């Protein structure tokens, strides 16, 4: 099998797997809803109540959510389908997430290199890096927003900083582990050639860290979307998926399908950035294999 046909097969397999996962989620959703409606909101054969109500306000039908995506909604002076409305909002969120992902990756890799170079830095910084992730984001986001506005920073910068806070951690930890992964024999070989530390870093340690970096990038990319949405909700911005979710939550009793549709849009955005990192991983690894061959 040629490399091109193998790539096409993998892509087709990924599409089929994603489609089957969506179908399974819809079947479970509708099956749970049907069961609750048939039994009066209890587990079959028992008097135990289901954990989530199955009425149309709490759990609208999946078909109703899908139909809402093509219904019209007001956007300023114009009217457009909800799917297009969410796509416009997602574009703003994607920009904020991309900035946060970039900054978080740079900071994470920079911290990893610093901790690799000086062991005292690892002992001093790594515990604090771990502790930083115990601070609730919902409490930290308003602080970052207030600080940013006092400094005169645009809202997109403050939101991106919230994404950065979430993304740097997995990159820093995984990058450090990857940079430390080369065998001691390989490191000693570089030393025997009198290779400078920088040469060892770029020629040996960074290539060895690739299998550790890309999984971290995937996690960081999805976290950047979460951070951007939380930031939009905290800052009260007029754009982004976070704003759409907040607005639809306030009108939940009237249009519950719109809130679910906006949540689906956020999930799709997360899957999109995850897919972009996966594609980059395949391209980089394929090029590496070609060079080795």
Spans of features found by a protein language model:
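Transmembrane-helix boundary motif in ABC transporter permease subunits
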Residues: 99-129
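Short cytoplasmic-facing helical segments at TM-TM junctions of multi-pass membrane proteins
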Residues: 174-213
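Generic hydrophobic transmembrane alpha-helix motif, especially the helices
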Residues: 126-170, 177-178
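Transmembrane alpha-helices
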Residues: 161-164, 197-231
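Transmembrane alpha-helical segments of polytopic membrane transport and secretion proteins
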Residues: 1-23, 275-293
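Periplasmic/extracellular loop-to-transmembrane helix junction in inner-membrane transport proteins
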Residues: 3-4, 37-102
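Hydrophobic alpha-helical transmembrane segments of polytopic membrane proteins
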Residues: 241-281
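Alpha-helical membrane-interface segments at transmembrane helix boundaries
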Residues: 87-95, 99, 122, 129-132, ...
């Amino acid at each position: 099998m040629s490399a091109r046909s193998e790539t096409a097969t993998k892509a087709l397999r990924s599409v089929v797997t994603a489609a089957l996962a969506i179908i399974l989620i819809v079947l479970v959703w509708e099956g749970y809803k049907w069961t609750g409606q048939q039994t009066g909101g209890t587990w079959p054969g028992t008097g135990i109540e289901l954990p989530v109500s199955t009425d149309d306000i709490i759990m609208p039908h999946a078909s109703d959510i899908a139909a809402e995506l093509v219904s019209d909604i007001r956007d300023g002076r114009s009217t457009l389908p909800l799917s297009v409305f969410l796509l416009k909002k997602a574009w703003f969120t994607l920009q904020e997430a991309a900035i946060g992902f970039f900054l978080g990756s740079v900071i994470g890799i920079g911290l990893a290199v610093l901790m690799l170079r000086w062991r005292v830095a690892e002992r001093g910084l790594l515990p604090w890096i771990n502790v930083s992730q115990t601070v609730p984001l919902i409490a930290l986001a308003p602080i970052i927003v207030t600080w940013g506005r006092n400094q005169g920073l645009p809202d997109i910068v403050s939101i991106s900083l919230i994404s950065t806070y979430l993304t740097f951690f997995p990159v820093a930890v995984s990058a450090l582990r990857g940079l430390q992964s080369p065998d001691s024999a390989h490191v000693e070989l570089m030393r025997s050639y009198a290779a400078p530390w920088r040469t060892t870093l770029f020629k040996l340690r960074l290539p060895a860290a690739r299998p550790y970096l890309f999984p971290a990038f995937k996690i960081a990319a999805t976290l950047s979307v979460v951070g951007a949405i939380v930031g939009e909700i905290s800052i009260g911005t007029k754009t982004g998926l976070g704003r759409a979710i907040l607005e639809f939550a306030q009108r939940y009793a009237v249009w519950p399908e719109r809130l679910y549709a906006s949540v689906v849009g956020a999930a799709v955005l997360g899957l999109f950035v995850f897919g972009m990192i996966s594609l980059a991983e395949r391209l980089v690894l394929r090029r590496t294999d070609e060079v080795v061959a």
